[in-house]
């Protein structure tokens, strides 16, 4: 979803809220529907998702979203750093066994669904 700068405060379920700070875009508090498990894959601390867009009910196999996983905030939240352009970003259900993730997670933690996810654009990603 491309959000016009003039509408950065709007927040719709299943779509990102975008905040513009000093011409940088930040995705903040993204409410997401649950993803299907097989769409998410953890490799070397990166979440790579050839996508589904549950909010629209259509699949877009040509998209590939990659996020550096920087930390597990709670059992319902991941802190991630954006690694690709910030638009059209949707997350889904992640692995039920975080042992599939690389460093930074404790094995045995379990996530059935990810609710709000905080995304920040890396300054080098401009």
UniProtKB/Swiss-Prot annotation:
The lineage of its organism: Viruses, Monodnaviria, Shotokuvirae, Cressdnaviricota, Arfiviricetes. This is Uncharacterized protein ORFC2. It comes from Pigeon circovirus. It comes from the Viruses.
